[in-house]
């Protein structure tokens, strides 16, 4: 596991279970590219085949994107392409007055939140929703679709069933 936030819950989980942990705060490096090269090297040295961005709030650069092309998955708190490209997707959904938003799992590309979609689940926007209540329901959807999307991608990468270039995606609950 690699993190840019050593105090996050995932890092604690890894430490408790002796899972290799790369603590790669940007402060340690001269550039984002240097950080991503270190992340690439860390992952490759541990035989990582699939990178899952869960709670990772940085944009990847060429060293990591090139090494793991088609094998980096991100979770985004909206039904992409709506409200992509930033950290305030939940706030945007509430401001816009949409009836539903949701969660998306997609492949990471050099274009922010624009990679092929693997799975989506819609979440209704309730009239009395706050950012916190809507974000909590979106997180619950993310927890459901991320494992399913990872299994789909694993099957593609292993050559079982769904070709790697397939546009097939999982539609979960109302998308």
Question: What kind of region is each of these model predictions?
Answer:
Residues 1-38:
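Short, surface-exposed acidic-centric catalytic microdomains
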Residues 21-22, 43, 72, 125:
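Generic signal for short, ordered secondary-structure residues
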Residues 27-59:
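Short phosphate-binding loop-to-helix
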